[in-house]
C-alpha cells in the first residue's frame, strides 16, 4: 500500500521534472501545474445527515516551498477553491445541505511528496447512506465532475492572473427533419446556458456523422444551431452534436438517426423519450436503509463498474460496523463486471428495424423537441416512441416521468387529429 501511495506522487514528479513547474528534478518535462487525488472517506451518521467533503494539503515540507519556488500554501488555495465549488454546485443543483467539513494541513504522502500544488479531496463518505443516495446518481457524478473541473480551472488561471471560460453544457431539443430539397436532412438543436456559470455560453457547435455501423467522423464545425446535409438513399445516418467555446467542448447530445428509403412509401418519426440515468432503487425506512439492485440496478451513463455486489446488510442499527450483517455489506459477485447503461443511441436500433421493413423513411428527435413544438406529431402517420427504462422515481432528484403533462396533451391531440 505504501508503494502504491508513494508511486502516485513520484510519477507526477517524474512526468513534471525538468519543466518550469518542477525545474530541479529530472524527468520528462511535462508542464503539470497541479495534482488532485479524489477519494471517498469512511464514517457514518445515524440520523441520515450528510457527511460531506474534506480537503487535505501539506505545508510543512521542503521549507514550505514547492519546486517552482512558490509557497506550499498554494495547495491550500487549491483545496479551498475546490471545496467551495463542490459545495456550491451540489447545493444549487440538488437543494441538499451538502457539508463542507474542513481543510486539514497534515502529513499525507499524496500532498507532501508532489513538487507541484496538490490536494486530496475526500468527496463523500462511502459508509454513509445519505451521502451515497447522491453518490450513486450519474447526474450527481456529472455535477461533481464539472465542479472539480471548474475549481481546477479557477485555480490554474488565478496562478497566471488570467480570466477563464468554462466549457458549455450539452445541447438540448435535438431534432432531425426531412429537408426541403431532395435527399437532404435538416438538424436543429438548442444551445444551453449554464445558470451556475455565465462564461459557459456556447459559441459554435460540432456535428458528428456516422453512416450505418461505422464510426463517427471528426465532425463539422457550424456557427449556428442548424445543419443541413445531403444523404444517400438506402443508408442510415446518425448524428450527435456538441457545443464549443474557447473553454472547450461539451458532452455530446443524444445520438439521433435518419434514413431516406430508395422508393419511399411513407415517413415515420422516432421520438427518443429514454433520457433516464439514475442510481439503484433506494430502501429508506425507519429500520432499513440501502440500495436494492435486484429491484432496480439503476441506469448508468453508458456503463458502470462501481458495484461490488448486491447489498445484504440493511439494518440501520448496524451502521458504522464492518463485516457481514453491517449496514451496507454486500456480496462480491459484481466485482469486475460492467453494468450496461443508457447509450442514448436507440433511434438507430429502432431505425434499422424500420429500414428492414421496406419502403419507409424515418427521422428522429428528442422528446423535448416535441414538447416545445419544434417537431409536430401530426406531420407523421406513424410515430415510434422510445421509452426504454424511463420512469418517475421519487427517490431521485431528476425528473424522468414517461409521459410529461405537455406530452400527454400532445399525444391526445395527435390521436384525435
Regions found by a protein language model. Name each.
Residues 417:
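Conserved small/polar residues in nucleotide/adenosyl-binding loops
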Residues 203-207:
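Short beta-strand elements bearing conserved aromatic residues within extracellular beta-rich modules
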Residues 155-199, 233, 248-266:
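Pro/Thr/Ser/Gly-rich low-complexity, intrinsically disordered linker/stalk tracts
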Residues 217-224:
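Short beta-strand segments within Ig-like beta-sandwich modules, predominantly Fibronectin type-III
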Residues 228-249:
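Beta-strand-rich modules
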Residues 1-51:
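Catalytic-core regions of hydrolytic enzymes
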Residues 255-381, 386:
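Aromatic-Pro/Gly-enriched surface loop or interdomain linker
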Amino acid at each position: 500500500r505504501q508503494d502504491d501511495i508513494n508511486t502516485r506522487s513520484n510519477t507526477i514528479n517524474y512526468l513534471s521534472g525538468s519543466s518550469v513547474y518542477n525545474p530541479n528534478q529530472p524527468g520528462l518535462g511535462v508542464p503539470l501545474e497541479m495534482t488532485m487525488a479524489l477519494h471517498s472517506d469512511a464514517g457514518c451518521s445515524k440520523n441520515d445527515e450528510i457527511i460531506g467533503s474534506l480537503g487535505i494539503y501539506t505545508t510543512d515540507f521542503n521549507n514550505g516551498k514547492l519546486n517552482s519556488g512558490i509557497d506550499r500554501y498554494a495547495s491550500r488555495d487549491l483545496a479551498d477553491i475546490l471545496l467551495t465549488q463542490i459545495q456550491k454546485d451540489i447545493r444549487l443543483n440538488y437543494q441538499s445541505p451538502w457539508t463542507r467539513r474542513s481543510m486539514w494541513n497534515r502529513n499525507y504522502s499524496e500532498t507532501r511528496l508532489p513538487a507541484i500544488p496538490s490536494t486530496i479531496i475526500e468527496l463523500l463518505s462511502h459508509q454513509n447512506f445519505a451521502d451515497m443516495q447522491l453518490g450513486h446518481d450519474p447526474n450527481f457524478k456529472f455535477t461533481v465532475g464539472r465542479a472539480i473541473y471548474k475549481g481546477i480551472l479557477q485555480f490554474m488561471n488565478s496562478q497566471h492572473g488570467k480570466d477563464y471560460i468554462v466549457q458549455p453544457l450539452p445541447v438540448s431539443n435535438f431534432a432531425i427533419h426531412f429537408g426541403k430539397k431532395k435527399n437532404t436532412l435538416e438538424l436543429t438543436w438548442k444551445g444551453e446556458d449554464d445558470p451556475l456559470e455565465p462564461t459557459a455560453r456556447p459559441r459554435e457547435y460540432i456535428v458528428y456523422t456516422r453512416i450505418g455501423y461505422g464510426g463517427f467522423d471528426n465532425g463539422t464545425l457550424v456557427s449556428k444551431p442548424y445543419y443541413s446535409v445531403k444523404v444517400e438513399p438506402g443508408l442510415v445516418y446518425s448524428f450527435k452534436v456538441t457545443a464549443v467555446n474557447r473553454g472547450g467542448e461539451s458532452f455530446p447530445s443524444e445520438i439521433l438517426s435518419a434514413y431516406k428509403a430508395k422508393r419511399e412509401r411513407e415517413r415515420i418519426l422516432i421520438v427518443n423519450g429514454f433520457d433516464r440515468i439514475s442510481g439503484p432503487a433506494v430502501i429508506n425506512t425507519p429500520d432499513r436503509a440501502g440500495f436494492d439492485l435486484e429491484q432496480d440496478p439503476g441506469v448508468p451513463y453508458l456503463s458502470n463498474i462501481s458495484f461490488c455486489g448486491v447489498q445484504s446488510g440493511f439494518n440501520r442499527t448496524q451502521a458504522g460496523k464492518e463485516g457481514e450483517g453491517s449496514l451496507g455489506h454486500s456480496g462480491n459477485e459484481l466485482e469486475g463486471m460492467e453494468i450496461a447503461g443508457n447509450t442514448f443511441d436507440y433511434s438507430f436500433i429502432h431505425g434499422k428495424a424500420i429500414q428492414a421493413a421496406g419502403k419507409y423513411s424515418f427521422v428522429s428527435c428528442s422528446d423535448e423537441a416535441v414538447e416545445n413544438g419544434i417537431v409536430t406529431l401530426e406531420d407523421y402517420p406513424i410515430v415510434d416512441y422510445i421509452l426504454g427504462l424511463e420512469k418517475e422515481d421519487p427517490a431521485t432528484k431528476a425528473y424522468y416521468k414517461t409521459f410529461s403533462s405537455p406530452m400527454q396533451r400532445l399525444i391526445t391531440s395527435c390521436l384525435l387529429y
